[in-house]
C-alpha cells in the first residue's frame, strides 16, 4: 500500500507495509502510483500515461529509481503481517498478561470540567475514595497477573487523585515493599488538575512518580471556559504557577501538560504555543471525546481547520527548535528508526487485557473510559476477571478484524 501527500513544500510517499518514508521530486511522485496500477507498462507507455509532461528519458531514469527501491524492499512492499498479528492477538487472549493498572484513587473532584467523561469524578455512580486495603489488593492483583513481566505501570487517576493523597503515599510504599518481595518494578504516574498541588505533593511526586501529568487546556480563556472550579470561577490562575514550578523541578522531563481542545478552540495550535511560551516543553493537547450533541463537540466542518492546525504546529515547532527553543508535542513523537513493534502498532492499546482500570471499591473495567458502564464490568480485584468474553473481544481486536481499518494507510 502506498500513501502520497504534499505538505510544507515536500512530496512525501509512505510505503505503508515497510514503514519507509520517501521525499521525492515531481516526476517520481507522479510515477509511483502510476507504476503501481500499471505493473507491466514500458517506460514509453508510462510517458504516454503522463500526458507528455516528461520526456521519455526522464521517465526512464525515474522509473529505474523506483524499481530499485522496490527491489530493496522499501516500495510496493506486500502486507505480510496479517497472520503474525492474528497469532499475536490470539496469544494475548490465551495467555493474558496484565501490564498496567489505572487506579481510580478518587471518584471525586474539585473542578467541574464541562467535558469530563467522569461526570465530576463520579463515573455514573457515587463519590468515593479508594481505601488502602483495596489499593493493596489491586497492586497484588497486578503482580499476580503480570506473568514474567518485570516492569509494571500504575497510574493514580481520578477524579482528582490528590484528594486522596495519603492513600497514594501509602500505596507507593506498599508497592516498593512488594517490589523487593517479587522482583517486580512499579513505574507510578500521577495525573492531577493541580488545584491541591503543593510542595509536599510535588516533592513526593519527584521522588516516586516516573511521570507526572498536569491537566491544563492552554490559554486562560480556553481553560477557564471548560475547566471551572466548583464555584464556577476559573482554574487557570490557580494552577499555572504550580505547574510551572513542577515542570522546572523535574528539569523539563518525565512530565507533560495535557490539554483538551473542543469546538470552542479549533485554533488549538495557539494553545500549544501558549503553553510553550509559558515555559512548558512537554505538551499534549488532544481532541475532546463526547456526545456529538454537546455544544462543545467537534463537528465535521471543523476538520479542515483542525488539520491545518497540525501543519501550523509542525512548522512552528521546527522554527522554535532551530532557534534553540526545545518543544516536544506528544502526538508528533514518531520514531522513524524504531518505535513500537508491528504487532503493537496493528493491535492497539491493550485495553481490556493488558491494561485495566480499577474503581475505588475494586471493580475492574477495560479502561477509564468504560468505568461505570456495567456491560463492560470485567470482575474485581478479589475474584479476578469473571466475564472472560470482554477481554477476548478487546484482545482479538486489530486492524485486520476491521474492514475499514484494513484499507486505511494509517
Where are these regions (language model features)?
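Short acidic, hydrophobic short linear motifs in intrinsically disordered regions
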Residues: 39-54
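A cross-family glycoside hydrolase active-site/sugar-binding cleft signature
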Residues: 102-104, 153-157, 189-193, 213-217, ...
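Acidic, low-complexity/disordered tracts enriched in E/D and polar residues
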Residues: 1-35
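Local cysteine-cluster metal-coordination motifs and their immediate loop/turn environment
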Residues: 108-118, 366-369, 403-410
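Conserved alpha-helical substructure of the radical SAM core
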Residues: 53-54, 60-69, 77-78, 83-203, ...
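C-terminal accessory region of radical SAM enzymes
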Residues: 304-338, 368-409
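Radical SAM enzyme [4Fe-4S]-AdoMet core and its adjacent flexible, acidic
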Residues: 221, 225-237, 244, 248-351
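Non-cysteine beta-strand/loop elements that form the S-adenosyl-L-methionine
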Residues: 202-220, 280-289
Amino acid at each position: 500500500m502506498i500513501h502520497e501527500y504534499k505538505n510544507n513544500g515536500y512530496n512525501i510517499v509512505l510505503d505503508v507495509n515497510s514503514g519507509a518514508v520517501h521525499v521525492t521530486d515531481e516526476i517520481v511522485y507522479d510515477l509511483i502510483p502510476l507504476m503501481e496500477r500499471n505493473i507491466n507498462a514500458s517506460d514509453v507507455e508510462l510517458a504516454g500515461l503522463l500526458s507528455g509532461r516528461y520526456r521519455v528519458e526522464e521517465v526512464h531514469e525515474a522509473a529505474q529509481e523506483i524499481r530499485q527501491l522496490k527491489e530493496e524492499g522499501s516500495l510496493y512492499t506486500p502486507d505480510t503481517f496479517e497472520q503474525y498479528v492474528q497469532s499475536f492477538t490470539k496469544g494475548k487472549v490465551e495467555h493474558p498478561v496484565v501490564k498496567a493498572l489505572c487506579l481510580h484513587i478518587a471518584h471525586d473532584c474539585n473542578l467541574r470540567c464541562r467535558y469530563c467523561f467522569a461526570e465530576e469524578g463520579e463515573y455514573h455512580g457515587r463519590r468515593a475514595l479508594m481505601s488502602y486495603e483495596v489499593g493493596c489488593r489491586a497492586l497484588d492483583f497486578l503482580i499476580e497477573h503480570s506473568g514474567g513481566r518485570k516492569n509494571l505501570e500504575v497510574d493514580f487517576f481520578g477524579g482528582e487523585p490528590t484528594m486522596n493523597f495519603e492513600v497514594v503515599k501509602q500505596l507507593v510504599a506498599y508497592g516498593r515493599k512488594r517490589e523487593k518481595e517479587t522482583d517486580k518494578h512499579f513505574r507510578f504516574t500521577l495525573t492531577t488538575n493541580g488545584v491541591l498541588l503543593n510542595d509536599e505533593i510535588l516533592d513526593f511526586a519527584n521522588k516516586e512518580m516516573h511521570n507526572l501529568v498536569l491537566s491544563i487546556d492552554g490559554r486562560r480563556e480556553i481553560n477557564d471556559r471548560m475547566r471551572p472550579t466548583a464555584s464556577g470561577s476559573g482554574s487557570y490562575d490557580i494552577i499555572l504557577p504550580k505547574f510551572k514550578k513542577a515542570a522546572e523541578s523535574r528539569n523539563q522531563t518525565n512530565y507533560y501538560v495535557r490539554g483538551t481542545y473542543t469546538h470552542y478552540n479549533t485554533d488549538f495550535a495557539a494553545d500549544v504555543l501558549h503553553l510553550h511560551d509559558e515555559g512548558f516543553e512537554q505538551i499534549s493537547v488532544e481532541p475532546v471525546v463526547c456526545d456529538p450533541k454537546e455544544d462543545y463537540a467537534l463537528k465535521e466542518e471543523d476538520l479542515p481547520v483542525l488539520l491545518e492546525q497540525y501543519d501550523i504546529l509542525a512548522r512552528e515547532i521546527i522554527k522554535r527548535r532551530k532557534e534553540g527553543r526545545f518543544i516536544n508535542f506528544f502526538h508528533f513523537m514518531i520514531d522513524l528508526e524504531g518505535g513500537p513493534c508491528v504487532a503493537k502498532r496493528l493491535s492497539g492499546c491493550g485495553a481490556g487485557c493488558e491494561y485495566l482500570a480499577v474503581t475505588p471499591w475494586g471493580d475492574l473495567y477495560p479502561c477509564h473510559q468504560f468505568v461505570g458502564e456495567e456491560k463492560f464490568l470485567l470482575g474485581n480485584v478479589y475474584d479476578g476477571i469473571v466475564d472472560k468474553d470482554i477481554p477476548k473481544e478487546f484482545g482479538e481486536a486489530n486492524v485486520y478484524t476491521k474492514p475499514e481499518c484494513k484499507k486505511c494507510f494509517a
